[in-house]
Amino acid sequence: SANTKNDFMRF
């Protein structure tokens, strides 16, 4: 995961 923001968007 590049950035946490994107990670949260995934879920």
From Swiss-Prot:
Q: Which GO BP terms, alphabetically?
A: neuropeptide signaling pathway
Which domain of life does the UniProt lineage start with? Eukaryota
Keywords (alphabetical) are: Amidation, Neuropeptide, Secreted
Intracellular or extracellular location(s): Secreted
Tissue specificity, in the record's words, reads: Detected in the thoracic perisympathetic organs in larvae, and the dorsal ganglionic sheath in adults (at protein level).
Cellular component annotations (GO), alphabetically ordered: extracellular region
Which sequence positions carry the modification called Phenylalanine amide? 11
**Family assignment?**
Belongs to the FARP (FMRFamide related peptide) family.
Question: What is the name of this protein?
Answer: FMRFamide-3
Organism name: Lucilia cuprina
High-level lineage: Eukaryota, Metazoa, Ecdysozoa, Arthropoda, Hexapoda
